């Protein structure tokens, strides 16, 4: 999640309100091993990675939120800017008060899609086709905060998690009008402490369902996709995930690797709701924002949003894929 425009004391108080007690990984067989920082990023230059999409060759594309950039990170850690989204005069993004690039998704042909939150008419989904400049393909409400982004190429749609409006938007992959696909209390931010104003955050498509994290509520949600494309009832799959940001599936089942931003942890949330910590600040995490998995390699960007030290991209290895 991007750094909120709040006093440091309030942020510290939020963190102090308690982190979920997780089941420790066994000392003899940790699920995630060989953690290393692939590249250390430049905080002063605005290189604070908010989200990640993987390329076929093992490299990655990340969003640098406040720099408004889409950057490419090679498999040996070199960083180059793919594109910078246009500056916006008088940006008024809710909670953040600045224009930020948040979620990112990659199509099979290399086209990238990102969320751009500005508090203006530029808020929405933008497309970056290979060799082209970024272009807006769908508008979203200026008073919202589009955050996570997921692509379902089979249905030809994108899903956007709006953290302020507590809504999952559905956008045609080719561009067009966004529709409110799912909303309600389970997706909304809290209205009282320990509220940060962030509801629906990360989003992923998994077979015939859309999974969403809710940061304020510390929950992981599943929303079935009905045969006509409409949203089914929201199911809570896990709770107690304080500071949850974005997440990924480390196998073919319903287990999830989730970034707990404020707790500097990545946890495994199994299908039965049990939680195990698999990576911590000792491994190099510094406000992790998202997780991606390709094969048995785990990618975790850290934005250093409150630690204010060492934004980075960390790699680790799964001992095995998770089948449940």
Go through the PLM ranges and name each one:
Residues 62-84:
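Beta-propeller domains
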Residues 34-41, 79-87, 135-139, 178-186, ...:
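Beta-propeller fold detector
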Residues 73-78, 128-133, 172-176, 224-229, ...:
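Short loop/turn segments that connect beta-strands within beta-propeller blades
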Residues 1-28:
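Secretory targeting and sorting signals
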Residues 119-153:
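Asp-box/WD-like beta-propeller blade repeats and closely related beta-sheet repeat scaffolds
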Residues 69-71, 124-126, 167-170, 219-221, ...:
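A short loop-to-beta-strand structural motif that recurs across blades of beta-propeller domains
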Residues 43-60, 88-115, 140-158, 186-209, ...:
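Beta-rich, blade/repeat-based domains predominating
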Residues 65, 117-119, 163-164, 173, ...:
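Short loop/turn segments immediately following the C-termini of beta-strands
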């Amino acid at each position: 999640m991007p750094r909120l425009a709040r006093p440091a004391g309030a942020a510290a108080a939020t963190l102090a309100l308690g982190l979920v007690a997780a089941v420790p990984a066994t000392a003899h067989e940790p699920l995630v091993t060989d953690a290393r920082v692939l590249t250390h990023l430049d905080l002063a230059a605005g290189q604070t990675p908010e989200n990640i999409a993987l390329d076929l060759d093992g490299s990655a594309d990340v969003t640098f939120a406040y720099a408004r950039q889409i950057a490419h990170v090679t498999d040996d850690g070199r960083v180059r800017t793919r594109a910078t989204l246009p500056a916006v005069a008088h940006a008024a993004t809710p909670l953040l008060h600045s224009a930020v690039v948040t979620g990112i998704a990659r199509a099979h042909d290399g086209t990238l899609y990102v969320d751009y939150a500005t508090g203006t008419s530029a808020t929405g989904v933008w497309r970056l086709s290979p060799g082209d400049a970024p272009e807006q393909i769908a508008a979203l409400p200026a008073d919202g905060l589009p955050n996570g982004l997921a692509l379902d190429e089979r249905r030809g749609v994108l899903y956007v998690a709006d953290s302020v409006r507590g809504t999952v938007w559905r956008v045609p992959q080719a561009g067009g009008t966004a529709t409110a696909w799912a909303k309600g209390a389970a997706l909304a931010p809290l209205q009282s402490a320990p509220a940060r104003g962030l509801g629906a955050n990360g989003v992923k498509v998994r077979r015939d369902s859309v999974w969403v994290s809710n940061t304020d509520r510390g929950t992981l949600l599943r929303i079935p996709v009905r045969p006509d494309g409409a949203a089914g009832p929201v199911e809570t799959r896990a709770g107690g995930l304080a500071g949850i940001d974005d997440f990924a599936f480390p196998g073919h089942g319903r287990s999830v690797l989730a970034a707990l931003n404020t707790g500097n942890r990545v946890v495994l949330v199994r299908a039965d709701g049990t939680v195990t910590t698999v990576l911590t600040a000792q491994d190099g995490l510094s406000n992790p924002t998202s997780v991606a998995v390709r094969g048995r390699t785990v990618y975790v960007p850290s934005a250093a949003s409150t630690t204010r030290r060492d934004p980075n991209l960390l790699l680790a290895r799964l001992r095995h894929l998770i089948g449940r």
